Regions:
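Hydrophobic transmembrane alpha-helical segments in integral membrane proteins
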Residues: 1-17
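Transmembrane alpha-helices of multi-pass inner-membrane enzymes
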Residues: 18, 394-435
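Membrane-interface helix-loop junction between the first two transmembrane segments
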Residues: 22-40
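Hydrophobic alpha-helical transmembrane segments of multi-pass inner membrane proteins, especially
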Residues: 63-294, 333-391, 418, 422, ...
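Transmembrane alpha-helix interface/packing and boundary motifs in multi-pass membrane proteins
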Residues: 163, 223-230, 307-312, 387, ...
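Long extracytoplasmic/lumenal interhelical loops at the membrane interface
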Residues: 305-342, 362-365, 369
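Short, charged, intrinsically disordered terminal tails
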Residues: 431-449, 493-510
Length: 510
């Protein structure tokens, strides 16, 4: 009986995911608030149903009551996120909130299936991150000096990355983490956000060649430190983000071309200098030939995706726990194996809809600084998603980055939730800009109406005065004579031939 429920559940979850994904893009076709709110409510129902079915299956498979309690805690968290954001900020983007909750729900499902203890840690991290993120939209909306701190952003980014080289710990062959008071922090995740603010502040108004050279030098310093730390994923993300933001700010394709050429040259140099780069390229070419020398992860990932096929094996029916670091870097492979490739494709489309919403907000912002920030964060998010999925599917060499909001990882989850909160703040800021525009239009209309209403009596008076004066002066200007009986002007009589003869006779007789 349990096997039947598990088998049916995977098809039901795929159907729910497809409908949810369809609604993510359908909402862009509507502009009226009533229809959009209806779609958002439907998305919430679909998300909670998918989440409930998955935890029901895991409870039946494990027969552990802690699954039920953990499920209830997650439901409370999702309700709190949806309600708090919509109550505190009534004008936030509901699509961004819904997609954030959906991605976190999928992450909780798969991490719980792989390791219950890690899932509990992830839940604590997400809860704390959400609490922190609630104040960020207020900061974005109220603090107007964010665009003036470019020197601070540059120094903070370089210092945070430099600290990792000095006191950092090696994780997975790369120097990524710093231990602070019993907690592990990955500075590169936070530096990505700081770097976006630095580039936006630097290029918001000044796109001169001199300023671009200075900004490029600071960006290159970030990338170089990350390459030395062997954090290739973060280095590629910062490189891609800078190229996109530079092109949008300057509108010069030549800069992008030069950047791509320089990046290609740097890649060749890195391949010659660093052994870990050569190993990853070799694994990318054919992971099965170097299975015992570094290709084990990618090979297991490809086999897991192939085993799951279109509809998946079902939760706890596959061997997802055999994939190395399946809860973080290779979580997409675990999802594809047990929940199916169709479900995994739906997950990709949800990430794409998040990126589209980021771009939509960026295009509607009028301030160049905020526009560049939204564009940079969107590029950071979608490029990290591309690196993660491309690496586990052997589309590109593996870079060791996590899938945002889905993979396990403390600093990664914190930085992504902060990123979403910044976007929400920019969305509210965009609504404020639209309100200001409408208010100014209304004021201009009222001013023009009051001005025309005040000028109308004066205009009528100016028009009527000459007419009245003309009427009074007409009797004085007439060439006729006034009769005593009627007191009105008579025109002079016409002179006829008979009257001329009588006049002549009178003159001769005189």
């Amino acid at each position: 009986m349990i096997n039947i429920i598990v088998e049916l559940s995977k098809y039901l979850m795929i159907a729910l995911m497809l409908v949810y994904t369809f609604e993510c893009f359908a909402v862009f076709n509507y502009t009226d608030e009533y229809t959009q709110r209806s779609i958002f409510r439907k998305q919430n129902v679909l998300m909670f149903l998918l989440h409930m079915i998955a935890f029901l299956v895991m409870y039946l498979q494990t027969n552990e009551t802690k699954m039920i309690g953990f499920y209830g805690m997650q439901v409370v968290l999702f309700l709190a996120v949806i309600l708090l954001y919509t109550i505190i900020y009534p004008r936030v983007s509901r699509l961004v909130v819904n997609n954030m909750c959906m991605l976190m729900a999928i992450g909780f499902i798969m991490i719980t299936r792989l390791s219950y203890s890690l899932a509990v840690k992830q839940f604590i991290i997400v809860s704390a991150s959400v609490a922190i993120s609630l104040v960020i939209p207020v900061i974005i909306r109220k603090v107007k000096a964010l665009s003036e701190w470019k020197i601070f952003y540059a120094i903070a980014g370089v210092v945070m990355l430099g600290v990792v080289i000095i006191v950092g710990r090696v994780t997975g062959g790369a120097m990524l983490n710093v231990a602070i008071g019993g907690f592990t922090l990955q500075p590169s995740e936070l530096v990505k956000i700081i770097f976006v603010f630095f580039v936006a502040a630097s290029l918001k108004t000044d796109t001169s060649f001199k300023n671009i050279v200075i900004t490029t030098a600071v960006a290159a310093m970030h990338v170089l430190i990350l390459v030395v730390s062997k954090d290739l994923g973060a280095a590629l993300i910062i490189f891609a983000v800078y190229l996109v933001m530079l092109y949008v700010a300057s509108r010069q394709p030549l800069y992008v071309l030069v950047g791509l050429i320089a990046g290609s040259g740097a890649s060749v140099v890195a391949y010659k200098l660093f052994n870990h780069v050569r190993v990853r390229v070799l694994v990318w070419k054919n992971p099965f030939t170097v299975y015992n020398e570094g290709g084990y992860q990618v090979a297991q990932s490809l086999m897991a995706i192939g085993t799951g096929s279109w509809f998946g094996m079902g939760l706890f029916q596959g061997a997802a726990d055999q994939i190395p670091v399946a809860e973080s870097d290779f979580i997409f492979s675990a999802i594809a194996e047990e929940m199916g490739l169709i479900f995994a494709l739906g997950l990709i489309l949800v990430c794409v809809s998040v990126y589209m919403m980021f771009l939509n907000i960026a295009m509607q912002l009028r301030d160049s600084f905020y526009k560049l920030v939204a564009l940079g964060l969107g590029t950071c998010y979608i490029f990290q998603t591309f690196l993660t999925i491309g690496g586990v599917t052997k589309f590109i060499p593996s870079t060791g980055v996590t899938l945002p909001l889905v993979s396990y990882g403390g600093t990664s989850v914190l930085s992504t939730i902060i990123m979403f909160a910044i976007i929400q703040g920019l969305y509210v800021l965009r609504e404020d800009e639209e309100e200001d525009i409408e208010r100014k239009k209304l004021q201009r209309r009222r001013t023009s109406r009051s001005g025309s209403a005040a000028g109308e009596p004066a205009r009528r008076e100016r028009i009527s005065r000459p007419k009245e004066e003309g009427r009074r002066e007409k009797p004085q200007q007439t060439n006729g004579w006034r009769t005593k009986e009627k007191g009105r002007t008579q025109p002079p009589k016409k002179r006829t031939a008979a009257s001329e003869r009588n006049t002549g006779r009178k003159k001769r007789s005189q």
